[in-house]
Amino acid sequence: MRLTYQTPEDAQLETMLPHIDILADSVPVDVLGKIPGYSDTVVTRPTREYLFLHETAIIGYHGTLFAAWYNSPAEELKGHTPIRGARSFDGGKTWSAPELIAYDPSGKLLYCPPVFGICDDTLYLLCNTMVSADHMHSLEFYRYDESDEKFHFLRSEPIPFKLNTNVCTLPNGKLLLPGRIAEMDSFPNTPAVLISDSGKIDAPWRLVKIQENGDLPDGSKLVHPELSAIIQDGLITIFCRNDLRKVPLLYQSGDGGETWSGPISHNIPFSSSKIYSGTLSNGKNYVIGSLSGRNRLSIFFSEPGTLEFTSGYDIRNGYDPVLDLYPQFSYPVACEMDGKLHVIYTMQTPERQKCIRGAMITSFPISCAACR
């Protein structure tokens, strides 16, 4: 079933694009319930030193959950902006005190965002540096050392490519990083991927643009084309954020990310905030995003091995009186470990303090009814 749009401009763009329905008509998007068996845990709260937090990441490695994010003193991407992180040794129930991972002592560069990857049983963290908010300068690589439990700097590459998801492994053994590219020290509005032909993280990566620029067929432009992938057999499907037009977009590649078709409109109503997607160990795909602005964070599940999404739940919906959280929950990232899917995201304190943010995790068993 196609979506109903509130503006003629949105409706016009959809008519100009190829379209696929991937969400079943039977899914009651407006009245999704809470996912069965869930638990919520605050990973880190705002502090006097760092009132602002955003763009979290999470991964499971050797039985430990690793989380990371960027902080700023008071406003988004202003002032001292480091990458910090925490670990959980009990499946996300409790978290260690935040630790510093990467920063610029001179204060000239901003660090944002972090992503994780595992290669040859080694954990890596990758992050960007910026000369100002979302003006990309470099891509940095860090490797985790279990002997001292720290991430160590490996190298910096002058690649103005903004990261968005953890490292993906392709069926051909190569690695994929979805994101967006810019000119050096400029704003990235062109969707693209990086590919590691060697299948190694600490190796050269090459750029493939998904489209030549950020223009859409109706003359509007992609602003923050944040990407997230589902990889099944020979098909890569990438969901793309679309700010100016509330038309959900995706791109597809059948040759390992070398060439792309799209944009294609679809009917999962995620558009103007970050989307995260992946595949569970049981073969079901999932996609997570914000509904109704950012006051709802929801997840949809597919049938195994397909892009037919037949069930969905809310991860968060509205004001939380227990935690006193204003309803803005956004920028999800997820990983599966020990039979659970762990979803980390930005949380926000009450509306009167819109720039005060922390990180939260919702975990639930993949044996729940929707995930089986």
Where are these regions (language model features)?
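Asp-box/BNR beta-propeller blade signature and adjacent active/binding-site loops
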Residues: 1-372
